[in-house]
UniProtKB/Swiss-Prot annotation:
Name the UniProt record assigns to this protein: A-type ATP synthase subunit C
Pfam family, one: vATP-synt_AC39
A GO MF term: ATP binding
Coiled-coil ranges from the UniProt annotation: none
Organism in which the protein naturally occurs: Methanosarcina acetivorans (strain ATCC 35395 / DSM 2834 / JCM 12185 / C2A)
InterPro entries: ATPase_csu/dsu_sf (IPR036079), ATPase_V0-cplx_csu (IPR014272), ATPase_V0-cplx_csu/dsu (IPR002843), V-ATPase_V0D/AC39_subunit (IPR050873), V-type_ATPase_csu/dsu (IPR035067), V-type_ATPase_csu/dsu_dom_3 (IPR044911)
């Protein structure tokens, strides 16, 4: 554990950062974030990466913003494992930096948003133990960008059973729900954790009165719509049309979609209803939408979300939105790199890998 803590560095407490009061330092924070955004990989990078092997890609990112992460972890990991850990470490440290350079309401909202990584980690830990994954495989997927430190997550990953993990989370807000986990209802628990996260996030936002909270709320509502739409596509393609099977999987608080209206529609009518929404432009150009792969559809929806964030950022340049734009674009970059590494390790074709990438 000492080695891991040394590699990752000591993590600042998130609890002390969550202050609603105080002055938000928008101008300073946005200026810093613009500099950070300029270091994101340009879209021209991805075709080049697809033509490289794993070792070449690792060397490439070692010469980029991920250099320190690769260098720090190179003594412990190699190949794809090194890349996974370096990407996750970089993402966590990047988000920690955002919390250090923000204050007041701005800091409070960002911290609330980043709690999604605690949800991600809890789901990863449960899934890993349920399917007997090795401790190393579990660690490879953990991202300490929420309140849980990497040291704490490492201790959880080393537990022998999922029940021991749940017991170790007794003091968290997730514990009452996790007590319902019986080893056979993972999908239910994961969905409820997601719903719990968004419910808590909307509670943190409260009734948005300030311009920043209104922008932030709209941003999250758009994200909820995109997530619900992805779920609806999966269910509709599977032939699920019963409201009592679909509605429990929907997240409340979306911007435009009416899941209760879409739930019972057959696939063709579902598509017709989508033509009336802002999301149609995102998927209208998908060839053979009725038979297109879910991967392509979901990639288009994520792309729309990213592009919308950029549009919001241009409309409100000195606000929380440019920072949120950077957060999701940074996450997307890490996801893209992870997809390429995993695809290369699995010997997937460049076409299959490319279909999963979201490149802006």
């Amino acid at each position: 554990m000492r080695l891991l803590e040394r590699l990752w560095g000591k993590k600042p407490s998130r609890k002390s950062d969550k202050k609603k009061k105080g002055t938000s330092n928008y101008a300073y924070a946005v200026t810093r974030v613009r500099a950070m955004k300029s270091k994101l990989l340009p879209k021209e990078t991805y075709p080049r990466l697809l033509n490289m092997g794993i070792d070449e890609i690792t060397r490439f990112i070692q010469e980029s913003e991920y250099k320190n992460d690769v260098d720090e972890l190179a003594m412990k990991y190699s190949g794809g494992d090194l890349a996974e850990h370096a990407l996750n470490r970089n993402l966590a440290l990047t988000y920690d930096k955002l919390l250090r350079i923000t204050s007041g309401e701005l800091n409070y909202l960002i911290a609330a948003y980043l709690l999604r990584y605690d949800i991600w980690n809890v789901k990863t830990l449960l899934r890993g133990k349920l399917y007997n994954a090795s401790v190393e495989d579990i660690l490879e997927s953990l991202i300490s960008a929420g309140e849980f430190t990497y040291t704490f997550l490492s201790e959880l990953a080393a537990k022998a059973t999922y029940q021991e993990i749940i017991d170790a989370l007794k003091e968290t807000d997730y514990y009452p729900l996790l007590q319902e986990f019986d080893g056979n209802n993972l999908a239910y628990i994961e969905n409820e954790l997601d719903k719990m996260y968004y419910s808590s996030l909307f509670a943190a936002i409260g009734k948005p009165r300030s311009k920043d909270r209104k922008l932030f709320a709209r941003f999250i509502k758009l994200e909820v719509d995109v997530k619900n739409l992805g779920t609806l596509f999966r269910l509709k393609k599977a032939g699920v049309e019963k409201s009592d099977e679909i509605m429990p999987l929907m997240i409340e608080g979306g911007l435009e979609l009416k899941p209760e209206k879409l739930a019972t529609l057959p696939y063709e009518q579902f598509i017709d209803e989508l033509r009336k929404t802002q999301y149609w432009d995102a998927i209208a150009t998908v060839t053979g939408l009725e038979t297109a792969s879910l991967t392509i559809v979901e990639s288009r929806l994520i792309r729309y979300y990213l592009e919308s964030a950029t549009t919001y950022s241009h409309v409100s340049p000195i606000s929380i939105v440019p920072i949120m734009e950077y957060i999701i674009h940074k996450n997307n970059e890490v996801n893209n790199l992870r997809i390429i590494f995993r695809g290369k390790e699995a010997d997937l074709s460049d076409t299959l890998i490319k279909d999963q990438l979201v490149v802006i």
